[in-house]
């Protein structure tokens, strides 16, 4: 028996053991559970959201009692909207009531209607069961899924018991989605998102809600997880534009301290929506996000910048990422109604200034052609030395800013043999970063975090190990290859020196004294193990690779 067969049998046995523990139920096969021990009595230790507390809860305050009475009075209004959904689904009244808050007993049916889960179930009868069984037999990430399930919402009464009912349902959903969407497969954030759906939806409904959330253009959440998704880069550019125009002092300080790309709150945007804040505020933000769509992402980050403006201007280069993440989470440690009030005001202000994220437009009926790309309306990155261009005329069918190809600016002209001249262009606002479009068929070069939906599919098989990336599979990440400026000049130079080209093919890779490994993480503080993957705060560089890497 060779090594491959031994490894395959070992993985199959490990997968069967994990599945068997969940089938047996609560705390099966674990003599010592590292997680919190479940309570046997939950008399006065559980709040209205289902969070289990260590001590007995105090009596309700006058404000909490008033909020409960308010939810009861609003229930009839939400029931009326669900009964006449065609009338209210695109109305302003739905948005207004979403900011005020959904009653808890209405949240499940409303999420199901917003994500159209019933229609998906009717179109795909029995498919969830098929995907679930296939995932049990052939999942490649079942160990990671099991580890993440064990740490998801453990303070909630539904997920308190190890190998309990809700943990088993969460495992089944993640295994089924890995088989349903191989492009995304499994990412760490998906366990938190699916757990939120399981709080209010049955197992199969929660699965189709997850499918619809990542597949919908309205929410654009797959761009955070897909290898070719450009949501992160588009939000980064849009955020830098909005902050530079509304808070120039804050952006100027970040440019001065070289914090433009390192301290972006978008790196922990997913964590803010699913982890790190109170469950009540998380659900309120999810309500707004499901109703408003991707437009709500930018106002959320803008509020954090506005609240933390004074602290940001005092942030130095020493450990900026860890300090900023802590302060960004502290932004939400306040009253839920106050946060939603500021969020609504920020949404209106950005809409007036045309700084919000435009909702995806619907193409013309009967036409399968792609939507036209509008002129840039302030979507380019504004860093030191850049000036804001006047807004262009809007197109008939606008689309999200990150779906458009980045504007190109000429950088240099390189003479090549035969009299031809190649003009190197870069996206505006990313001067100094080579164009990823040149990476096709070119020599190997440095790695840059740069992605656009209009880019061709590039190799993303980077496999990095280390303390920073212990639980994250970079084959499912958004890292792409780009060519350094030196490598762009290599084809012309090798054409003039054919002997050197042959000699360089057999040259050994260089080993720098300050690089013990091929990759070096530039993040000054590792991501917290409880957070999602920080997609915007890392920067990797490679040493010179041997040919054929």
Swiss-Prot record:
As for subcellular location, the record says: Cell membrane
Bias type Low complexity, positions: 398-417
According to the entry, every stretch annotated as the Rab-GAP TBC domain falls at: 101-293
SMART domains recorded for this chain? TBC
Q: Cite the residue spans of the region called Disordered.
A: 350-423
Q: What else is known?
A: TBC1D3 is encoded by a collection of very similar paralogs with multiple copies of each paralog, some human genomes encoding well over 50 copies depending on ethnic origin of the donor.
The protein in question is named TBC1 domain family member 3L
- Organism, by scientific name, is Homo sapiens
The encoding gene is TBC1D3L
């Amino acid at each position: 028996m060779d090594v491959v067969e031994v490894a395959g049998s070992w993985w199959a046995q490990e997968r069967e053991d994990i599945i068997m523990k969940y089938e047996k139920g609560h705390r099966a096969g674990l003599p010592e559970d590292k997680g919190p021990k479940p309570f046997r009595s939950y008399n006065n230790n559980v709040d209205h959201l289902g969070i289990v507390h260590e001590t007995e809860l105090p009596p309700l305050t006058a404000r909490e009692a008033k909020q409960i009475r308010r939810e009861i009075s609003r229930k009839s209004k939400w029931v009326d909207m669900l009964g006449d959904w065609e009338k209210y689904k695109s109305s302003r009244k739905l948005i207004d009531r979403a900011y005020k808050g959904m009653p808890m007993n209405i949240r499940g049916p409303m999420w199901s209607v917003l994500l159209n889960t019933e229609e998906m179930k009717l179109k795909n009868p029995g498919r969830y069961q098929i995907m679930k069984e296939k995932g049990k037999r052939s999942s490649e990430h079942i160990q990671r899924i099991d580890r993440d399930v064990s740490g998801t919402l453990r303070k909630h009464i539904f997920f308190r018991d190890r190998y309990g009912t809700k943990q088993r349902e969460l495992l089944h959903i993640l295994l089924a989605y890995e088989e349903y969407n191989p492009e995304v497969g499994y990412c760490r954030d998906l366990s938190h998102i699916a757990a939120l759906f399981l709080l209010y939806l049955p197992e199969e409904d929660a699965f189709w809600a997850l499918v619809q959330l990542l597949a919908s253009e309205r929410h654009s959440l797959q761009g955070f997880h897909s290898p070719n998704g450009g949501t992160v880069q588009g939000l980064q550019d849009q955020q830098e534009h909005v902050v530079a125009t509304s808070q120039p002092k804050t952006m100027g300080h970040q440019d001065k301290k070289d914090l433009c790309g390192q301290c972006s709150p978008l790196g922990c945007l997913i964590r803010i929506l699913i982890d790190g804040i109170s469950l009540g505020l998380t659900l309120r933000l999810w309500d707004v996000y499901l109703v408003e769509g991707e437009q709500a992402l930018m106002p959320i980050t803008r509020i954090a910048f506005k609240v933390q403006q004074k602290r940001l201007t005092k942030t130095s280069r020493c450990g900026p990422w860890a300090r900023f993440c802590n302060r960004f989470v502290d932004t939400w440690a306040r009253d839920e109604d106050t946060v939603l009030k500021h969020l609504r005001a920020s949404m209106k202000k950005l809409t007036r200034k045309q700084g919000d994220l435009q909702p995806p437009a619907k193409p013309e009926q009967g036409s399968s052609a792609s939507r036209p790309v509008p002129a840039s309306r302030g979507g380019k990155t504004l860093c030191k030395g850049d000036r804001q261009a006047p807004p262009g005329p809007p197109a008939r069918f606008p689309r999200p800013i990150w779906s458009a190809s980045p504007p190109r600016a000429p950088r240099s002209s390189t003479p090549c043999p035969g009299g031809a001249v190649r003009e190197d262009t870069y996206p505006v606002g990313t001067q100094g970063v080579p164009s990823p479009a040149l990476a096709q068929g070119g020599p190997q070069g440095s790695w840059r975090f740069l992605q656009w939906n209009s880019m061709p599919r590039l190799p993303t098989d980077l496999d990095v190990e280390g303390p920073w990336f212990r639980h994250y599979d970079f084959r499912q990440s958004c890292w792409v290859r780009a060519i350094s400026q030196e490598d762009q000049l290599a084809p012309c130079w090798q054409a003039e020196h054919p002997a050197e080209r042959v000699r360089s093919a057999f040259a050994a890779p260089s080993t720098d004294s300050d690089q013990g490994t091929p990759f070096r993480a530039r993040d000054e503080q590792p991501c917290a193990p409880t957070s999602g993957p920080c997609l915007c705060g890392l920067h990797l560089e490679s040493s010179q690779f041997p040919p054929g890497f």
